[in-house]
Amino acid sequence: MQTLTQGDWLMRSCLGVLATTTLWLAVFGAGSAHADVLRTGDDYGLLVGSAAAPVQLEIFCEPQCPHCAELESTYGDPIATGLASGRLAVTYRWLTFLDDKHHNDVSARVSNALFSAADPTTPAMAYQALVQDLYRHQSPDGPNNSDIAAMARESGVAAVVADRIAAGDYAVDAATLNEANGARLDEVNPADPGTPTVYDLKTNRVVDIQDPGWLDALSS
């Protein structure tokens, strides 16, 4: 029988730890918790997808904006395809200015729910599916929290996160959110600071979304 020295035991122990660590990284990735939806550094944008994706878009939306609904209706599925392929990431910047115009709190509630959905357990595809579903159900009174939670579950958001949405748990201050993202929108699109605005973070230019092929051109 071979006698192992203290050095042999140490070497085998180190190799075992290395093998275990390598396997863990292969399965779970280098981070302690991989998240497909993250808050941006200023805390008011939501990065959906990988920060390493070659196409990085910043999209300014208002939950009650009909033109934003048109954008998601036309381009939501191609955006989802880009997210799934890893070629595209979207930083959503939600605004709530239409609450004052319509004398309601729909945009504030929906934006709060969308920030609640930005959880480490939420896949990018689930978040994008929720965005599209919310715009499909756009209405003057808006969905209530239970309705939003049901859409979240159907989109693939974890049940515990959907429960927080249903309860209306606080996730973001709507007024501060609108102020911060409004200032950012004025910065990137001073000539026409409306919603939706799509901004290319790679070229630092506003995207002409009136061109039907804008997304294909960016993704090619």
Which residues does each PLM region occupy?
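C-terminal cap of thioredoxin/glutaredoxin-like
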Residues: 153-220
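A short, hydrophobic/aromatic-rich structural module that often spans a beta strand
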Residues: 139-151, 169-172
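Alpha-helix capping and helix-coil boundary motifs
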Residues: 123, 142-147, 158, 210-214
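Structural alpha/beta surface segment adjacent to cysteine/selenocysteine redox centers
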Residues: 69-146
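Extracytoplasmic thiol/disulfide redox context detector
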Residues: 2-102, 175-189, 213-220
